[in-house]
Amino acid sequence: MNKPLIRTERNGDWLRFGVKVQPRSSRNQIVGEHEGDLKIKVMAPPVEGAANQALQKFLAELFKLPKKDIRIVRGETSRHKIVEIRGIEAEKLLAFIPQITK
């Protein structure tokens, strides 16, 4: 299986990348890559920030980081978001994706 190409960049201590969120899913999961962004399904509806909170919680649990180390920097009302995570390197993010999407 080829490694998905997720565009990432450093912003100081933070790793920045795009996420396409699909709310109201049957479970929280990474489903792969979508146009250079990480595609993630969350169970929460896109109402009053519930899907954003679910996304932050899911990523924090996935990477074993506190929620304060996950932030949405753009796209709070859109399905296309820019997310930053403090405490991981791009290699860890990219290496982790195939394990989930197989």
UniProtKB/Swiss-Prot annotation:
The lineage of its organism: Bacteria, Bacillati, Bacillota, Clostridia, Eubacteriales. One of its GO terms (cellular component) is cytoplasm. This is UPF0235 protein Swol_0959. NCBIfam families: DUF167 family protein. It comes from the Bacteria. Pfam families: DUF167. Coiled coil: none annotated. Belongs to the UPF0235 family. It comes from Syntrophomonas wolfei subsp. wolfei (strain DSM 2245B / Goettingen).
